[in-house]
C-alpha cells in the first residue's frame, strides 16, 4: 500500500502498546475522505488499510460524494465492521476484510453511528441550516437508506449502545439521554427517552464507554467529563477535565490507555494524536484528524 503522506513519530516510549500483544496496536483514523488504519507497533507508525468512498463500486454514485469529511469511525464486532458517519451527509457500515459497504444512508451532518439489536442501526445527524438534521434515525441494516423512525434532538454528536442497561445513550447540545428500544420487534420501532441528564456545560461532542466501569467519557466545548450511567452524575475527567475542543476520546479496553484528538486553534482537526499512561504524542504530517479509535487486537482463532 502506498502511504500518501509522511507519518512522523514525535515520541513513543517503551510502553504496553508495543510490548503486550493483547493490547490494541492499531487505531482507525478519519477526518477527510480517507478512512485508514494505522499500525503503532512499529518505530514509525504506518498505514496498513485504507478506504475511500469514491473507490467503492457497490456504493451508489450519488452517495460517493457524501464521505468527503468522515466525522466518525468506530470499530464494531471485534473490528470486523467499521461504522462511519460523515459531516458531508453520509453514513455507512463497512466490512473491514473486504472494504465492502454493507449499508449506507444519507445523514445530514452525520456525526455518529451505532449498531443496535435486531439487525438495526442508529445514525446521529447533527445540525444543518436547512434540511433534516438534529435527529437520531433508525434503519434496518438490510434496507439501506429506508428510515424506520427518527427522534428530534439538538446537535447530536455521539450514540452508544449499552447492552448491560439495554439503553441507547446519545449526547446533544444540552443533555445526555438514555433511550429505551420500544416496539423493537415490529416494523415500527421507536426510541423512547428514559433518562435525561443535563450537561454540566454546553455542546456534547464525543462520547465512548470507559471499559470495566459504569462511566462514559464525554467531551464538551470546554471540558471532558465522566458520566456515571447508574447515578447519572458528571465529574471532570482526572486527566482531561479542563481540556477544551477534544474532538475524539477513547480508552483501550485491554491496556486502559487513553487516546484523544484535540482541535488546534480555530480549526476542527489536528495532526497530533495524544496518548496517556505513558504520555506520548504522534504527529501525522499533512493529515486532518477528527476521530481516532483503538482497533480491537486480533484474537487467536
Model regions and ranges:
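An edge-strand/N-cap motif at the start of beta-rich repeat modules
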Residues: 24-43
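Short coil/turn segments that connect the beta-strands within blades of beta-propeller domains
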Residues: 25, 78-80, 118-120, 164-166, ...
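Short loop/turn segments immediately following beta-strands, especially the blade-tip
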Residues: 40-44, 180-188, 229-234
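A short beta-strand motif characteristic of beta-propeller blades
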Residues: 47-64, 99-105, 145-151, 192-198, ...
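Blade-loop segments of beta-propeller domains
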Residues: 51-81, 86-89, 97-114
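Repeated scaffold domains used in trafficking and secretory/extracellular systems
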Residues: 60-74, 107-116, 153-161, 200-209, ...
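Short, solvent-exposed loop/turn segments at conserved positions within beta-propeller repeat blades
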Residues: 86, 126-134
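Loop/turn-rich, solvent-exposed surfaces of beta-rich toroidal or solenoidal domains
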Residues: 201-265
Amino acid at each position: 500500500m502506498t502511504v500518501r503522506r509522511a507519518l512522523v513519530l514525535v515520541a513513543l516510549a517503551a510502553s504496553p502498546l508495543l510490548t503486550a500483544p493483547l493490547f490494541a496496536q492499531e487505531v482507525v483514523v478519519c477526518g477527510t475522505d480517507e478512512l485508514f488504519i494505522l499500525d503503532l507497533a512499529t518505530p514509525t507508525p504506518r498505514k496498513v488499510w485504507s478506504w475511500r468512498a469514491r473507490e467503492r463500486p457497490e456504493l451508489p454514485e450519488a452517495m460517493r460524494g457524501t464521505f468527503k469529511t468522515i466525522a466518525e469511525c468506530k470499530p464494531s464486532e471485534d473490528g470486523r465492521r467499521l461504522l462511519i458517519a460523515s459531516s458531508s451527509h453520509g453514513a455507512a457500515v463497512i466490512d473491514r476484510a473486504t472494504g465492502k459497504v454493507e449499508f449506507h444512508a444519507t445523514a445530514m451532518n452525520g456525526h455518529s453511528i451505532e449498531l443496535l439489536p435486531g439487525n438495526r442501526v442508529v445514525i446521529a445527524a447533527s445540525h444543518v441550516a436547512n434540511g433534516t438534521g438534529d435527529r437520531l434515525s433508525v434503519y434496518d441494516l438490510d434496507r439501506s437508506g429506508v428510515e424506520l423512525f427518527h427522534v428530534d434532538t439538538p446537535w447530536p454528536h455521539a450514540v452508544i449502545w449499552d447492552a448491560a442497561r439495554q439503553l441507547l445513550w446519545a449526547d446533544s447540545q444540552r443533555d445526555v439521554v438514555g433511550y429505551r428500544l420500544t416496539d423493537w420487534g415490529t416494523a415500527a420501532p421507536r426510541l423512547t427517552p428514559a433518562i435525561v441528564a443535563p450537561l454540566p456545560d454546553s455542546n456534547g461532542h464525543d462520547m465512548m464507554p470507559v471499559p470495566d466501569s459504569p462511566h462514559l467519557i464525554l467531551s464538551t466545548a470546554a471540558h471532558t467529563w465522566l458520566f456515571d450511567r447508574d447515578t447519572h452524575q458528571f465529574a471532570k475527567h482526572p486527566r482531561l477535565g479542563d481540556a477544551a475542543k477534544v474532538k475524539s476520546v477513547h480508552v483501550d479496553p485491554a491496556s486502559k490507555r487513553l487516546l484523544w484528538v484535540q482541535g488546534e486553534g480555530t480549526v476542527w482537526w489536528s495532526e497530533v494524536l495524544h496518548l496517556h499512561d505513558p504520555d506520548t504524542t504522534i504527529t501525522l504530517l499533512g493529515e486532518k484528524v477528527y476521530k481516532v479509535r483503538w482497533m480491537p487486537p486480533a484474537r487467536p482463532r
